[in-house]
């Protein structure tokens, strides 16, 4: 026969066990600037995997990008916020901005898991990047912290030595480099970036000089 305390303990344990972990997608990038391709990818992953939210995580100082072509992280974060403000699935993740310095995914995800140990993270990358996972910093430790989500790309295999969930999403041939070049030449970027992002770029005179 169980005592009241034993019964209460059992109920509490079962309740705690039944609490589902939050399932959060992470889309990292320079977002220089964010464009509709980013939003479509994030929406498709969130919907298909049933995630609680998808967070856009701007790099503070990208390890593999020419710093001369990367505008201030504050502007990039502000543009992300403008791009996602009307979508309840999306959030801005500032972990790499808070940490500062060069952004390595392993260090950032270790930081996030320490803050939110009960959150299950899904790290979203293009299918063209999956082949290069073996070159990522501390990849063997990183795969213990996150589940990788690969966006299928034509011409790239859907296999990997690492665990990857593959997702189909519309292929939108938009690049931030292309957008910067168009702006620097005075061309329209309508339908390439959200209207709020285009307005922010114009207001702050971003990318007006040639790359």
Swiss-Prot record:
It is an enzyme of class 2 (transferase). Pathway: Cofactor biosynthesis; NAD(+) biosynthesis; deamido-NAD(+) from nicotinate D-ribonucleotide: step 1/1. InterPro entries: Cyt_trans-like, NadD/NMNAT, Rossmann-like_a/b/a_fold. Keywords: ATP-binding, NAD, Nucleotide-binding, Nucleotidyltransferase, Pyridine nucleotide biosynthesis, Transferase. The keyword NAD applies. The keyword Metal-binding does not apply. Catalyzes the reversible adenylation of nicotinate mononucleotide (NaMN) to nicotinic acid adenine dinucleotide (NaAD). GO terms for biological process: NAD biosynthetic process. Its EC number is 2.7.7.18. This is Probable nicotinate-nucleotide adenylyltransferase. GO terms for molecular function: ATP binding; nicotinate-nucleotide adenylyltransferase activity. CDD domains: NMNAT (cd02165). It comes from Lactiplantibacillus plantarum (strain ATCC BAA-793 / NCIMB 8826 / WCFS1) (Lactobacillus plantarum). Belongs to the NadD family. It comes from the Bacteria.
